[in-house]
C-alpha cells in the first residue's frame, strides 16, 4: 500500500472519543490517512486523568502530531476540537512540522466573536447539562437510562465544557494556512452562513464555508459524511495542484 500523501488529525467534540472519527478511515480518499486524537480520560485513554487545562491538552496533542513530522497534514476540529486547534498551533509554531500544515477544517461557530466573556456551562446542574446535550440530538438513551453510566459521562462532559468555556477567552491569531468551515444546516447554534464566514478574519487564505444537511453532528449521517469527506479530498487536491 502506498504511503498516504496527507495525515488528517481529527479533534473530537466535548464528551466524545476518537472513535467518532473511526468510520472516516474507510470513506476518505486513499491519499489521506485519518488519525483521530484521543483526549486523556476519554475512549481508550479512559483510565488516564481528565485534563481541564487547554494548554496542557494542546501541548499533548501537538507532541502527538510531531511524531508524524515527515508527512504534510490537515487539522480537523469539531466543536471544542475547533477551539483546541488554535492552542495546538501555538505549540507547533516554530517547529519544523508547522511547515507541513496544509489545511484547517473548522466545524464550529466562531464563539469568541459572539461571546465576549467566559461562559460557565461547566457549572450548570446535571439536569441543565442533559437538556443542553439533548438540543444536539446525540444523547444516547442507554446512557440517559443508566444512572451509573450517566454519572460517569457527566463527569467527562463537565470537564470538556470547562475546556470549552476557557477557550472562549483565547486570543485567536491570524494564520496563512487555508481554512474552510463546515456546518450543519439545522445546527441550533448556527442560525446563518454569515456566522461561519466570520472565520475568514483568521486566515490569509479563506476557502469559504460549506453547509451540509443535518444538525450539530451532521457528519454522523453516512451520506452526509461521504459528501463532507469528498469535499475535503477535492480541496486538498486543489491545494496540491497549486503547490506543484
What residue ranges belong to the model's regions?
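Non-catalytic, mobile gating and regulatory segments of ester bond hydrolases
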Residues: 1-244
Amino acid at each position: 500500500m502506498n504511503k498516504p500523501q496527507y495525515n488528517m488529525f481529527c479533534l473530537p467534540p466535548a464528551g466524545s472519543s476518537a472513535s467518532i472519527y473511526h468510520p472516516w478511515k474507510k470513506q476518505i480518499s486513499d491519499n489521506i490517512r485519518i488519525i483521530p486524537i484521543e483526549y486523556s480520560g476519554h475512549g481508550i485513554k479512559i483510565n488516564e486523568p481528565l485534563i481541564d487545562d487547554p494548554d496542557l491538552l494542546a501541548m499533548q496533542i501537538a507532541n502527538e502530531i510531531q511524531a508524524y513530522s515527515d508527512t504534510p497534514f490537515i487539522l480537523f476540529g469539531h466543536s471544542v476540537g475547533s477551539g483546541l486547534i488554535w492552542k495546538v498551533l501555538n505549540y507547533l509554531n516554530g517547529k519544523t512540522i508547522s511547515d507541513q500544515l496544509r489545511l484547517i477544517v473548522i466545524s464550529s461557530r466562531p464563539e469568541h466573536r459572539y461571546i465576549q466573556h467566559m461562559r460557565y456551562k461547566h457549572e450548570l446542574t446535571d439536569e441543565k447539562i442533559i437538556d443542553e446535550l439533548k438540543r444536539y440530538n446525540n444523547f444516547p438513551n442507554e446512557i440517559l437510562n443508566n444512572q451509573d453510566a450517566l454519572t460517569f459521562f457527566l463527569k467527562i462532559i463537565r470537564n470538556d465544557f470547562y475546556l470549552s468555556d476557557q477557550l472562549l477567552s483565547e486570543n485567536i491569531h491570524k494564520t496563512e494556512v487555508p481554512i474552510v468551515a463546515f456546518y450543519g444546516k439545522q445546527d441550533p447554534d448556527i442560525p446563518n452562513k454569515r456566522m461561519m464566514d466570520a472565520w475568514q478574519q483568521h486566515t490569509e487564505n479563506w476557502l469559504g464555508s460549506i453547509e451540509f444537511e443535518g444538525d450539530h453532528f451532521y457528519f454522523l449521517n453516512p451520506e452526509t459524511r461521504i459528501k463532507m469527506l469528498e469535499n475535503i479530498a477535492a480541496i486538498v487536491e486543489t491545494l496540491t495542484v497549486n503547490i506543484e
